[in-house]
Amino acid sequence: MRNAMNETWMAGKWFDPRAAVLICVLLMVAIAATQSACAAQAETAPLRVAIVGLEHGHVEGFLHALPAHKDVELVGIADADPALWKKYGVKFALPDTLFYKSMANMIERCHPQAILVYTPISEHRHAIEIAAQYGLPVMVEKPLTISVEDALAIRNVAREHHIEVLVNYETTWYASNREAYNEVKQGELGAIRRVVVHDGHQGPKEIGVPPEFLGWLTDPAQNGAGALYDFGCYGVDLMTWLMHGETPLTVTAVTNHDKPEIYPRVDDDATIVLTYPHAQAVIQASWNWPFSRKDMEVYGATGYAITVGADQVRVRREHDAAERLMTAPPLNKPEDDSLDYLAAVLSGKIEPKGDLSALDTNVIVMQILDAARESARTGRTVRLTRVGE
């Protein structure tokens, strides 16, 4: 007998339990190492993104920035216009194999992990609905869509298919806006009393946007409105963020057609006034500014913060003898860039709820813009109640 060796007779051979334990341990270590390696590979693998639509001029900014994002891989582009394939293919040395006429075909062949939409605003809902069928998250250019009806439909499909829908605004990545927000959050300005936002430029035709962009930008059926939507959305988004998603009590808007010979179908200047129980916002959106601008003034009960460009703020607090100009602290990664932010949301590092890009914020933005359009049309103030959750 080999009791001293703790051996057992099995299947006609001697079997050592200690060897079995060792083998099990080694297998567990190997499996853990494999899983760790796979997780690390997934963590470092580039995010596979696809573009839908080339009619939006902002797609050029994305393609310019793409080479700096080694953690992002463009795997496909869907657009029905071969002339735009050629335009961007030549300009950015993109291979012909990237381009598809059908969004669904592109998704099935390229297997992206996220969709970036650069279509006319009116097509956002359709693109999101297709992406949802494949369980793919979507980032669209501002604003979310052209009506509150579409916004609610997008929210429903996002919930049904458990996908993220984000909205990209240039001003989200301004350190100056974050610093103004932090001044309020930290109590340096007291309770918000008044916010004034200015956004716009000399006009899309005046600054030379490409014809495929200008065509839909000046069509109310495709853009929702003119300057009212194109630039009013920035201030509405910022105010909704500052107010932590509170719906205003009333929306009043007036629009002008100062250049009807250039923009006969849409407004080129708009002012939106939002009232809250203890605060007011005045949003001035225009295609008639003498220069491009995106700035915000936040006035509290005891101080103010006025943004200057993307990274400076003029601040005066309660006991300051005069205002001071400060450089806003740089935004921390991944909240300093749309693609980094998208990747962080998809990996679970960021919960977007309440953010400038978040769907819940932008459903409220669309409710306000829709009401502003109606107010401008009728000449009456529109009273709001929060849309159902």
What are these regions (language model features)?
Residues 109, 114, 120-121, 125-172, ...:
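Beta-strand-loop-alpha-helix segment that lines the small-molecule cofactor/substrate pocket
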Residues 20-34:
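Bacterial N-terminal signal peptides
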Residues 38-92:
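N-terminal Rossmann-like dinucleotide-binding module
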Residues 96-102:
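Conserved SAM-binding strand-loop segment of SAM-dependent methyltransferases
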Residues 1-17:
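N-terminal secretory signal peptides that target proteins for export/translocation
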Residues 41-43, 114-116, 344-389:
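C-terminal helix-rich "cap/oligomerization" subdomain common to oxidoreductases
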